[in-house]
Amino acid sequence: MENIHIQTKSKEYDVHVGREALSHLTTLIQKMNPAVSNIMIISDEAVASLHLQTAVDALQVEQKVFSFVVPSGEKEKSFENFYEAHTSALENKLDRNSLIIALGGGMIGDLAGFVAASFMRGIRFVQVPTTLLAHDSAVGGKVAINHPLGKNMIGAFHQPEAVVYHTPFLHSLPEKEWRSGYAEVIKHALIGDVELYHWLKEEVQTLTDLRDEKLIHILTKAIPVKANIVSQDETEKGIRAHLNFGHTLGHALEKELGYGNITHGDGVAVGMLFAMFLSEQVYKVDLSYEEMKQWFLKYGYPKMPSDLNVERLVQLMKQDKKANAGTIHMVLMQEYGGVNVVSISDETVHIALEAFQKDMV
């Protein structure tokens, strides 16, 4: 098992990665101080049907263990489910010494983490990711639910006690979820580990290569990129915004197409391509955009939909959390491994989006 140490101003914890990582969960809980009183597992229907019993069986503890299961899908990261989770916690007599376990992908990690952050003004939680995408969201303490007007608009910063990445859980993922998570791996490589980027181009020819030792290698290289940034900027006052590379357009596409109609990773992949397309114009540099586009298409990432209204996308991009005083701020790339947050006028974004949309046809 590989261990990755995460250090922030508010907390230090470890990410445990491996084929036997789940066996470490009981020991982690037994070492917690103050002692854990009882345990609430939050999951979704798809994950629960596959892995909930495995997780419960792995918890060889004396404490009461109960579960709260929501329907699957990004749209379930809602205030209604957040409220119902609190109701379940109260009915089952959770207290300030209780523990919440987030068993699932990024949606569950965000929802369960925000429940933990707000229940009795904050209790402990552990992330047990079941998707590749969650290698990003499970680390760093950003937890949130969606609002009809925007993604992740209601939330908090609340670090987990630990992240337990039991890689066999990923074996049940459909291809679209492998692709979605791999987009965030590519993002981490592009912004913070150029050596990993070149390794991916050589070693991951198809999504089926994301297995076994290669999967563990990818996780142990991509997670430290985020860990390094979070250690310097826990609450996104500066360089943590670099982790939003590709997300300004990506989130706009998710909102416009409807949560669940495009995966987060597919949206981010299109967003990264657009960011590189625009970066070449802004910085007058050659980032091999055309080569990158073909590389993305090889994995099955979508093209920019040709029928989307560009002005509508511009307005949605202005609702992004990085926007300031109604001005779009995007993470752009000067070179591989070197990104910055840049303010961009509506007109510039509109013109670039139209050109990008035509280029992707």
Swiss-Prot record:
Q: What does this protein do?
A: Catalyzes the conversion of 3-deoxy-D-arabino-heptulosonate 7-phosphate (DAHP) to dehydroquinate (DHQ).
| Enzyme Commission number(s) from the entry | 4.2.3.4
Originating organism: Bacillus mycoides (strain KBAB4)
Q: Which GO terms describe its molecular function?
A: 3-dehydroquinate synthase activity; metal ion binding; nucleotide binding
Q: What name goes with this protein?
A: 3-dehydroquinate synthase
Q: Where in the cell is it found?
A: Cytoplasm
According to its UniProt record, where is this protein mainly located? cytoplasm
Q: Is Ion transport a UniProt keyword of this protein?
A: no
The record's PANTHER family line, in alphabetical order, gives: 3-DEHYDROQUINATE SYNTHASE, 3-DEHYDROQUINATE SYNTHASE, CHLOROPLASTIC
Q: Which of this chain's residues are annotated to bind Zn(2+)?
A: 184, 247, 264
Q: Which UniProt keywords apply?
A: Amino-acid biosynthesis, Aromatic amino acid biosynthesis, Cobalt, Cytoplasm, Lyase, Metal-binding, NAD, Nucleotide-binding, Zinc
Cross-referenced InterPro entries: Dehydroquinate_synthase, DHQ_synth_AroB, DHQ_synth_fam, DHQS/DOIS_N, DHQS_C
Cofactor requirements of the protein: Co(2+); Zn(2+); NAD(+)
What does the sequence similarity comment in the record state about its family? Belongs to the sugar phosphate cyclases superfamily. Dehydroquinate synthase family.
Q: Does the keyword Mitochondrion apply?
A: no
**How is this protein annotated for GO cellular component?**
cytoplasm
Q: Where does NAD(+) bind?
A: 72-77, 130-131, 142, 151
Co-factor note (free text): Binds 1 divalent metal cation per subunit. Can use either Co(2+) or Zn(2+).
Task: Cite the annotated pathway.
Answer: Metabolic intermediate biosynthesis; chorismate biosynthesis; chorismate from D-erythrose 4-phosphate and phosphoenolpyruvate: step 2/7
**Gene Ontology terms describing biological process:** amino acid biosynthetic process; aromatic amino acid family biosynthetic process; chorismate biosynthetic process
> What does it catalyze?
7-phospho-2-dehydro-3-deoxy-D-arabino-heptonate = 3-dehydroquinate + phosphate
